[in-house]
């Protein structure tokens, strides 16, 4: 079970976007990286194609999983993730507040 999943609210811990929050768009577990909306935005020169014109576009670049942390559901500060058995389901729990992260 992954600690960070698509749709999670995360906080950037290091780098040029330190302290910014965003939603995880995609997780790449083999590369240990994730795409976060509005974080690590880069400009790319796009070549013209049949359905897209040329120009400079901005898009999110991936960020290493060690540089982001889940935002605590209670106060929005970064927290570590633990696991707990709730009935017959395994759920993610914020170590900071003890709140369940999963729905």
From Swiss-Prot:
Belongs to the universal ribosomal protein uL24 family. One of its GO terms (biological process) is translation. It comes from Rhizobium meliloti (strain 1021) (Ensifer meliloti). Pfam families: KOW (PF00467), ribosomal_L24 (PF17136). The gene is rplX. Keywords: Ribonucleoprotein, Ribosomal protein, RNA-binding, rRNA-binding. The keyword DNA-binding does not apply. GO terms for molecular function: rRNA binding; structural constituent of ribosome. Part of the 50S ribosomal subunit. This is Large ribosomal subunit protein uL24. One of two assembly initiator proteins, it binds directly to the 5'-end of the 23S rRNA, where it nucleates assembly of the 50S subunit. PANTHER family: MITOCHONDRIAL RIBOSOMAL PROTEIN L24. GO terms for cellular component: ribonucleoprotein complex; ribosome. The keyword RNA-binding applies.
């Amino acid at each position: 079970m992954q600690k960070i999943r698509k749709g999670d609210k995360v906080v950037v811990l290091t780098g040029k976007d330190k302290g910014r929050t965003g939603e995880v768009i995609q997780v790449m577990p083999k590369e240990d990286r994730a795409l976060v909306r509005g974080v690590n935005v880069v400009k790319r020169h796009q070549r013209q194609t049949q359905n897209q014109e040329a120009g400079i576009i901005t898009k999110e670049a991936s960020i290493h999983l060690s540089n982001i942390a889940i935002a605590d559901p209670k106060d929005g500060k970064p927290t570590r993730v633990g696991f707990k058995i709730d009935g017959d389901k395994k759920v993610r729990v914020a170590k900071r507040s003890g709140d369940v992260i999963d729905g």
